[in-house]
Amino acid sequence: AIAAGVILLWMGAAVRRLITEKGRRGRIVYRFVLTVVCTVLTVYAGFSLLWGVNYYAESFQEQSGVYARESTPEELARVTEYFARQLAGCADQVQRDENGLFAESRADIFAHSVRVFDGIYDEFPCLVMEDRVPKGVRFSTALSAMDFTGFYFPFTGEANLNIDSPACYLPSTIAHEMAHQRGIASEQECNFIAIAASTTAQSPAYRYSGWLMGFTYLSNALYRADQEAWKQVRVLLPDTVVADLRDNSAYWA
């Protein structure tokens, strides 16, 4: 916000000089364009140094030895069913409102974030680092308009989260952005890490959100592969989980 304010003030000053210093307009425009170009190049260079290099670094698969492979529809159905049963089993462990929707405090979710990776450090020591509490974005409705649930900002090293969207996915999304803080560039790898961390966390909210995120991706893939198998798995979900899924779909529609 401060940076945006500085840019607006600088642009306002440039416009004012164009109006008041008519004899020097050419020089003012030249300096304005030069400053913009230099600023863009500096930001690009900073982004490349602070984040872009991660696209060429050793991937999480290479660091961990866990590699993705193609699965059969039968394997996909079995794993999706497993996630559905785990999700159903922890659905009543989280706070809910009068409509049966996930109602855990966002403040508590953020507070518990610094311990979410503890359960997978032994298995994945490449992820060990000291965590900081991520930040909720004040203008989250703007993020929603752009279909963003969160983002990692490499210039500050902060994980920034949308706090306007349904909270049931907030814990696992926090874990996803915290995976980016560990230098993991791949979105799919960050999803895997987020699900692994969340489902083994001490916090019921994180466990539920982790199983929910995993089920969502698996269920979508199963629907594309075998709709009959998808229907058999879908009926395993309790009404509370279905309510969360529908609420999330309605929000993003």
Locate predicted features:
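Auxiliary, metal-adjacent structural segments of Zn-dependent hydrolase domains
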Residues: 94-167
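Membrane-interfacial, low-structure loops and terminal tails that flank and connect transmembrane helices
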Residues: 17-30
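Membrane-interface segments at or immediately adjacent to transmembrane helices
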Residues: 52-119
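Pan-zinc metallopeptidase signature
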Residues: 239-253
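Post-HEXXH active-site segment of zinc metalloproteases
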Residues: 186-214
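Active-site recognition of the HExxH zinc-binding catalytic motif
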Residues: 170-196
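Internal/C-terminal transmembrane anchor helices
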Residues: 27-54
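Membrane-embedded alpha-helical segments of integral membrane proteins
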Residues: 1-18
